[in-house]
């Protein structure tokens, strides 16, 4: 469960009663797509003939460019998550990251789903002794990609939703891990 019971109005679009502008919604979608794309090879190495996660990332970006409607991007996200379901480990998490990225068009808060699943994919791809450091590096890499205009919003949201995102954004002591 990556979505909170109580929505943050800063992550609800203006047309739905929140304060999130379309421009910032687009930035969140692009960032989520970047996070998912960064780990996509962990899926494609295992499932080279399945392009559903790649198409989901492409649809997320196409939605930002107004080339596809929200429902098309969201549907592509569902197909990517369908590609994830029969798998295990890094490939599964990478496909889920792509699916979450495409669903940002529908619900902006899926941005952290894409980021969290990407971090989990990296962690699942390495030996347990290397896991914490690999996940920390991925988290920091993601934060380095954040557009300045939404950086504080995303970092605050990571802090707020860390517990429901498998604690990948901060250690169990509440401190930021990256």
Mark where each language-model region is.
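C-terminal binding/interaction regions
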Residues: 20, 124-178
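Structured binding/interaction patches within domain cores
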Residues: 1-139
């Amino acid at each position: 469960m990556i979505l909170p019971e109580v929505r943050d109005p800063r992550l609800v679009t203006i047309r739905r009663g929140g304060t999130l502008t379309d421009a910032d919604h687009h930035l969140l979608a692009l960032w989520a797509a970047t996070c998912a794309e960064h780990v996509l090879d962990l899926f494609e190495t295992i499932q080279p003939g399945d392009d559903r996660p790649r198409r989901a990332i492409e649809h997320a970006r196409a939605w930002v460019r107004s080339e596809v409607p929200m429902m098309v991007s969201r549907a592509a996200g569902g197909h990517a998550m369908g590609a994830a379901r029969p798998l295990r480990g890094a490939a599964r998490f990478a496909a889920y990251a792509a699916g979450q990225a495409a669903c940002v068009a529908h619900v902006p808060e899926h941005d952290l789903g894409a980021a969290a699943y990407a971090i989990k994919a990296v962690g699942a791809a390495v030996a347990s002794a290397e896991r914490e450091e690999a996940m920390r590096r991925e988290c920091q890499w993601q934060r380095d990609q954040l557009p300045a205009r939404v950086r504080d919003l995303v970092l605050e949201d990571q802090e707020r939703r860390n517990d429901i995102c498998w604690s990948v954004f901060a250690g169990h002591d509440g401190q930021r891990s990256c």
